[in-house]
């Protein structure tokens, strides 16, 4: 099956052109490598979309040679995209700049992903991202001694953390073959409730990342579930905001540019 992504325009061009948040002043080795992966992924995704247009045109031609050539070219591009995604999933970020760049990579892949379709590459990258957030974010965003998160954010995230814990427990209790069982429907409902809140604290972001990682480990094709897109976007937004605040200082204004 050919990859059918959304037309790469708007924010995609901004990311590819280097105007996104994935362009910190400091040069970190992991960020340098991830920025190159991001450029490659964007370019190959565009090539896939344009290749599909060529396929549609070739299919209407009386000569089958053009269609077969377009098919072969599309398969080559998709194979290259799969390899780059596989390489990206194997490259976990180790710095603030690297984690911010991984945010942009995952945001691009999630927003070009056809909801309801499974994607092993997306699943692998989402798993690496969730693990990186869980392990790296507390260290990168460690507050000064005595500093506390705003009260409303801590209270809001306390409820999210409880929901995430309950969802993980339900996930472990539901048999994998019970795809349409009552418990599975309840799990989907809990994920939808969790998606209503963007974490505002490190603890909340880590809880959400841990839940996403558990879902990816426990559920085949979790990225095809209805709740995948909002959960991922919420986590990306939360991580970017927390890292921006850490870079700017506890009392500083966020430095991330709003989406165009």
Task: Put a short name on every predicted segment.
Residues 1-260:
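Sequence/structural signature of long amphipathic alpha-helices
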